[in-house]
């Protein structure tokens, strides 16, 4: 400090060594100011949620809306993953048919099932005609359809029915995945992945972490300097169990994780954006699977998706309120944290575009205003 003052007021009073040290001090100060300006123009969002809640799909949507999107070459690169998802889905149904003792309705289906089961999904790069025909035939089997209707009893990718409904197109020679095919593709997130997007004058750094339990221990070093949390929760998992644990209800696990995250000291004053995702799957599922069977507290009509959405939002709101209160129900102390909730369909680009605009205009606005970027 004294050297810096002397350098500004009386530089000729300093020795050569002191002048050199002062120049280094000035350069360090300049670099720190430059870094501070860069940081001021960046917002860090932490993306959390249990496995298969839709985090990776949300990131893909951000790339489409605020990034470079997916060129034809990019989409071609997703072909093996689409084929893998199809094989994994059909193999899961075949295994479930045996376990649930559901018979095939066609005599040739057993041969087709054996052919499909002989393929290693993780080594698939093409969709050979014989496999495509076998999968198409199986999907027309009434027994396979009956097994699909019991999908809550086994683990099946959400995208299964989408891909199986587009088999003819996907099996064509020269197939190039569409943007929707890319959005529906599923690969478990492992480790920690960072994505940067530019929204107007703002740089958004979104940190996506693995949703499976085994991945959560890696989150800890992501918690510093977070502008806001985005927590994705699947509305449709109320009647499903964890893939890692066939006994634990997936929605209960998501609620527990939400409470754990809110209780962490790093997030006492961090705004929380709750995306209640997969509205499309919920709307279809409530027709045959009653929410009250798994959550007896639900008193609404059994086939009313709007009532189901409101009830599930209330479950998360209670967890949020509980995290803000002590054991006696009193507030733990003053906090500026707020909860912003939205219903989303992560595979619907227009829905995510609108929802994220709402998020930016509300949750992020005060941060952007502070750094004069609005």
Swiss-Prot record:
InterPro entries: Gprotein_alpha_Q (IPR000654), Gprotein_alpha_su (IPR001019), GproteinA_insert (IPR011025), P-loop_NTPase (IPR027417)
BP terms from Gene Ontology: adenylate cyclase-modulating G protein-coupled receptor signaling pathway; calcium-mediated signaling; phospholipase C-activating dopamine receptor signaling pathway
Residues reported in the UniProt entry to bind GTP: 49-56, 183-189, 208-212, 277-280, 346
Molecular-function GO term, any one: metal ion binding
PROSITE patterns: G_ALPHA (PS51882)
Swiss-Prot/TrEMBL keywords: GTP-binding, Magnesium, Metal-binding, Nucleotide-binding, Transducer
Domain of life: Eukaryota
Chain residue ranges for the region called G4 motif: 273-280
Pfam families xrefs: G-alpha
Positions of the UniProt region annotated as G5 motif: 344-349
GO cellular component, one term: cytoplasm
KW Cell division (keyword) present: no
Domain G-alpha: 41-374
PANTHER family per the UniProt record, alphabetical: GTP-BINDING PROTEIN ALPHA SUBUNIT, GUANINE NUCLEOTIDE-BINDING PROTEIN SUBUNIT ALPHA-15
Subunit architecture: G proteins are composed of 3 units; alpha, beta and gamma. The alpha chain contains the guanine nucleotide binding site.
Identification of the protein by name: Guanine nucleotide-binding protein subunit alpha-15
Gene source species: Oryctolagus cuniculus (Rabbit)
């Amino acid at each position: 400090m004294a050297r810096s003052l002397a350098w500004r007021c009386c530089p000729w009073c300093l020795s050569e060594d002191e002048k050199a040290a002062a120049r280094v001090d000035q350069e360090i100060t300049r670099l720190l100011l430059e870094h501070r300006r860069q940081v001021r123009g960046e917002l860090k969002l932490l993306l959390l949620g249990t496995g298969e809640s839709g985090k990776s799909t949300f990131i893909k949507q951000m790339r489409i809306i605020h990034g470079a999107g997916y060129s034809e070459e990019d989409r071609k690169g997703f072909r093996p993953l689409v084929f893998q998802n199809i094989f994994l889905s059909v193999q899961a149904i075949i295994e479930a048919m045996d376990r649930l003792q559901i018979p095939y309705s066609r005599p040739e289906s057993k041969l087709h099932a054996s052919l499909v089961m002989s393929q290693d999904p993780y080594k698939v790069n093409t969709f050979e005609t014989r496999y495509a025909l076998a999968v198409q035939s199986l999907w027309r089997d009434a027994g396979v359809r009956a097994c699909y209707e019991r999908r809550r009893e086994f683990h099946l990718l959400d995208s299964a029915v989408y891909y199986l409904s587009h088999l003819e197109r996907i099996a064509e020679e020269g197939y190039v995945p569409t943007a929707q095919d890319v959005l529906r593709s599923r690969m478990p997130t492992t480790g920690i992945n960072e994505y940067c997007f530019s929204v107007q004058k703002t740089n958004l750094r979104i940190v996506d972490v693995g949703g499976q339990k085994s991945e959560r221990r890696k989150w800890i070093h992501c918690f510093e300097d977070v502008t806001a949390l985005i927590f994705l929760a699947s509305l449709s998992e109320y009647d499903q169990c964890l893939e890692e644990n066939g006994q634990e209800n997936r929605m209960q696990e998501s609620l527990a994780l939400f409470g754990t995250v809110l209780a962490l000291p790093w997030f006492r004053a961090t705004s929380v954006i709750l995306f209640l995702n997969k509205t499309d799957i919920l709307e279809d599922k409530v027709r045959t699977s009653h929410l009250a069977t798994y959550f007896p507290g639900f008193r609404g009509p059994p086939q009313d998706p709007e009532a189901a959405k409101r009830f599930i939002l209330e479950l998360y709101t209670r967890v949020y309120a509980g995290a803000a209160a002590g054991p006696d129900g009193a507030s733990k102390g003053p906090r500026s944290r707020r909860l912003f909730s939205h219903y989303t369909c992560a595979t619907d680009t227009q829905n995510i575009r609108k929802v994220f605009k709402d998020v930016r205009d509300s949750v992020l606005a005060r941060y952007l205003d502070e750094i004069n970027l609005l």
